[in-house]
A protein has these predicted regions:
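Boundary/entry segment of secreted carbohydrate-active catalytic domains
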Residues: 1-16, 176
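Hydrophobic faces of well-ordered beta-strands that scaffold small-molecule active sites
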Residues: 6-12, 27-31, 58-60, 75-77, ...
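Short, acidic/polar
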Residues: 11-23, 62-65, 102-109, 154-160
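Acidic (Asp/Glu)-rich catalytic clusters
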Residues: 19-25, 50-53, 89-92, 111-112, ...
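N-terminal active-site wall of soluble small-molecule enzyme domains
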Residues: 26-90
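Glycine-rich phosphate-binding active-site loops on the catalytic face of alpha/beta enzymes
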Residues: 34, 75-87, 117-132, 153-177
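Alpha-helix-loop-beta-strand connector modules within alpha/beta enzyme cores
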Residues: 43-59, 82, 86-103, 131-154
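Glycine/Thr-rich beta-alpha phosphate-binding loop at enzyme active sites
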Residues: 69-81, 95-141
Length: 177
């Protein structure tokens, strides 16, 4: 029996070629930098060019207009983004919209926002509001969208992901081990 291949999503906030080169071509990179209020457009364009040459997909967090303007592979809408104004824009055919949620209310908001996949966090104990496997299964069963596990995933606990009905997993620490 073969294991199903899970999509991998890596959250980055800097352009570090050493870390990027350690990842395989199936890893999708999501750039998010919540420390600054303004995106560094030069950094985003350099990342886009570098990742495109490598064959990786590149998404931008929480900035729909800029993702369209720079013709990125898509956008990631964090759980705190409850806006629907992006629905007024037309996108190209392979543009991906992803979103994250922590509870049922946020899942319904993300479905209304038109996301293709919902990142549900936090699966493993990394903070006080982690879900655990049973709550994660229960919450994810309320959506027909593709579900991506997020939070506390490491190389040690990836075997547990096979117990879940998910299309992929996302994180930071897993990719930096």
């Amino acid at each position: 029996m073969h294991d199903k291949l899970l999509k991998k999503y890596y959250f980055i906030n800097s352009f570090d070629t050493n870390i990027i080169n350690k990842q395989d071509k199936t890893t999708t990179f999501i750039y998010r930098d919540y420390k600054t209020t303004k995106f560094d457009t030069n950094k985003i364009l350099k990342l886009k060019t570098y990742l495109k040459r490598r064959g990786n997909k590149f998404l931008l967090a929480n900035n729909f207009k800029m993702a369209l303007k720079f013709k990125l592979d898509g956008v990631y809408l964090p759980s705190f983004n409850n806006k629907f104004d992006h629905l007024n824009y037309s996108t190209y055919s392979n543009f991906t919209i992803l979103g994250s949620a922590h509870n049922l209310k946020e899942i319904k908001i993300k479905e209304t926002q038109g996301v293709q996949s919902i990142f549900i966090s936090s699966l493993f104990k990394k903070n006080n509001n982690f879900l655990g496997i049973n709550k994660f299964k229960l919450i994810s069963s309320y959506s027909k969208k593709n579900i991506v596990a997020l939070g506390g995933i490491s190389k040690k606990n990836t075997r547990v992901l096979r117990l879940l009905n998910i299309s992929g997993f996302a994180g930071i620490s897993y990719f930096e081990e």
